């Protein structure tokens, strides 16, 4: 679906559907008043009958409104006089998108500029959320359905903005389109079945991306190279599977050669049975989403490539399949990491930190400005923060603050958890330098503490997306595409875009 921005009068546009906001109590904004005047009071007459209360997201479709070039007018409730919050604004946009998808027209014009959104002064923030919501609503994953979804009639949406805000709105749509592309790619990878999406498949996806973009270099390290580098923890996770592990390195050079890169590290466990520490059978199908950290790094890179941001970015995808077998890692095994630290593996289901710790050590060679790892790491994060907010930890307050701010701006929020030294003691092992679990308490924090021991050479942050990477059960089940908006916003901010 194509999104464009124009600065024209709503009453003059020729379109299949014109969308106009109406407030509670039959209050008309400037656009609605102009449409009402052009239609000789048709809008007011409908509202007087009480057909639309004007609550946010309520809709009423009118056909053949006199005095207008639009075939239909869709009235949408915009609430009371005060500004809408992000959530209400997104719900309004999703409601409009839902109605438009059910209509026969190939285009629509949204005249929603009169609506104010709290904390979104100017046009950029408001139009960015609007565009992202509209584009996200167009996502369909039916690759394995014998009956595909009906082709959508709606091909183009025009967003109206006043002349003063036109440039900001256009920039917002440009950024939103890139983010939506990245989110769709992330969701596609996450939704693929694990018999298709394994480490070698992700490596092929990376190579395909490299062929499509000249400025992107791709290197794939196989299990032999992983072992040669001394990545004992990484190798241990995949040794029970017939699908060999892969470390995928993608290097984008959009900035000056002398500029230090940002590094994104993604956990890519393409299926997690728990290994010998086997998970319960109920809901295990959702462990195909354990690679959503890597998928979100892929998606963020897609957005960066589309926008051609003037930064240097290295993406490291730590991909393995965690399976039980005669050759699998056992609880009690001790491995030596690339850093030289030894790890006692008390629970083979705490495998994400094992592939990440060696990858974080590998990241040192790029002399990064900052390293951010993204992982569906702990069920404890879902207990602590639910499915609305990602967990965030780090060793640098400025970096953590930048990510928190990016999350707010992108409406893809994170919440900081502590990394106090007292938590480190829970990882003590009588037999190795460190244990891979820290007991039943503060599981998200102790996982972050584990990773912090391998990230002392640079500014580092860790995003635990166990609660936000996918939606469980119901008709909306599937990968969410998060935290692509947060990560892309962080990089947009660093690029000054």
Curated annotation (Swiss-Prot):
PROSITE patterns named in the record: CYTOSOL_AP
EC category: hydrolase
GO MF annotation, one: metalloaminopeptidase activity
Keyword Hydrolase part of the UniProt annotation: yes
Highest taxon of the lineage: Bacteria
Positions annotated to bind Mn(2+) 2: 267, 272, 290, 351
Keyword terms of this UniProt record: Aminopeptidase, Cytoplasm, Hydrolase, Manganese, Metal-binding, Protease
GO biological process, one term: proteolysis
Cofactor descriptive note: Binds 2 manganese ions per subunit.
UniProt KW Cytoplasm keyword: yes
Pfam families: Peptidase_M17 (PF00883), Peptidase_M17_N (PF02789)
UniProt: Mn(2+) 1 binding residues: 272, 349, 351
Name assigned to this protein: Probable cytosol aminopeptidase
Gene designation per UniProt: pepA
